[in-house]
Amino acid sequence: MSESLKIIFAGTPDFAARHLDALLSSGHQVVGVFTQPDRPAGRGNRVTASPVKQLAAQHNIPVFQPESLRSEENQQKVAALNADVMVVVAYGLILPKLVLEMPRHGCINVHGSLLPRWRGAAPIQRSLWAGDAETGVTIMQMDIGLDTGDMLHKLSCPIEAADTSATLYDKLADLGPAGLLTTLAQLADGSARPQVQDESLVSYAEKLSKEEARLDWSLSAQQLERCIRAFNPWPISYFVIDEQPVKVWKASVLPAVNGHQPGEILQANKQGIQVVTADGVLNIEELQPAGKKAMKAQDLLNSRREWFTPGNIIA
């Protein structure tokens, strides 16, 4: 392979851990790992180390967990590692300009979209909700802006009709490490050719909110079906009926019908609960009432058929 690089890795969730795992098998030297402090997680709310920390510990790599990289003390920890490059994947902390410039090759980031489309916090979900035909990963040189740095490498993949944020996350977590290793090889041998992002093509992927997850029947059935897939596995799309939230895990789109208003229940049977939208009918196939597990529409109808009487309106 080309020159072995001394790498600092900064990341936190499983998505990042998959990239660290690829680096550990690559012949490069990971000299230190930065990750978020241990935090409560899971049903028991027990304090848990991040997937990246757990993997680093298995390989006896020094781990640093600062609350911020703005202090001189923490910046000195970065400098002391004397790295050639810092690889940042879903880390969760802002890197000050001083830190960005410390390694010989600076800091590079793996971003879950085809930049400059979907800069920001939720590129996977926003690409799904928007109905994009494809997405991918971009490895970029980091600067002080929000995902504004020069692009070093891109890999794309199609967005399939059944993709959810969970399945797309897995696809990009498989795609990213290959792009990262290619980029590192190009940095090492001097063949990297950074490309400036076209500002006229920029879009922003704002962080998701639970409020956005409420189904709005004034949208089209197609938009709502994409929303359901984009918000799976979090925060899960929902509607409110009888003052109770009901999460929607799966739905399909049926042709439009005349003479009905958005939110009106058209039919409710073993095929699903059919709700009129601004354009088309949303057929809800799998849903989850409060305090229950996800279930097929027919199973909920067995206990709550009165909720879904044809002609009723879901607000």
Swiss-Prot record:
A GO cellular-component term linked to this record: cytosol
SUPFAM superfamilies on file: FMT C-terminal domain-like (SSF50486), Formyltransferase (SSF53328)
EC numbers on record: 2.1.2.9
Top-level taxon: Bacteria
Annotated positions binding (6S)-5,6,7,8-tetrahydrofolate: S113, L114, L115, P116
Record's catalysed reaction(s): L-methionyl-tRNA(fMet) + (6R)-10-formyltetrahydrofolate = N-formyl-L-methionyl-tRNA(fMet) + (6S)-5,6,7,8-tetrahydrofolate + H(+)
Keyword field contains Transferase: yes
Matches recorded under InterPro entries: Fmt (IPR005794), Formyl_trans_C (IPR005793), Formyl_trans_C_sf (IPR037022), Formyl_transf_N (IPR002376), Formyl_transf_N_sf (IPR036477), Formyl_transferase-like_C_sf (IPR011034), GART_AS (IPR001555), Met-tRNA-FMT_C (IPR044135)
Membrane-spanning residues: none
Statement: the UniProt record of this protein carries the keyword Protein biosynthesis: yes
Record GO terms (molecular function): methionyl-tRNA formyltransferase activity
Annotated keywords: Protein biosynthesis, Transferase
Role this protein plays: Attaches a formyl group to the free amino group of methionyl-tRNA(fMet). The formyl group appears to play a dual role in the initiator identity of N-formylmethionyl-tRNA by promoting its recognition by IF2 and preventing the misappropriation of this tRNA by the elongation apparatus.
Family: Belongs to the Fmt family.
Stated name of the protein: Methionyl-tRNA formyltransferase
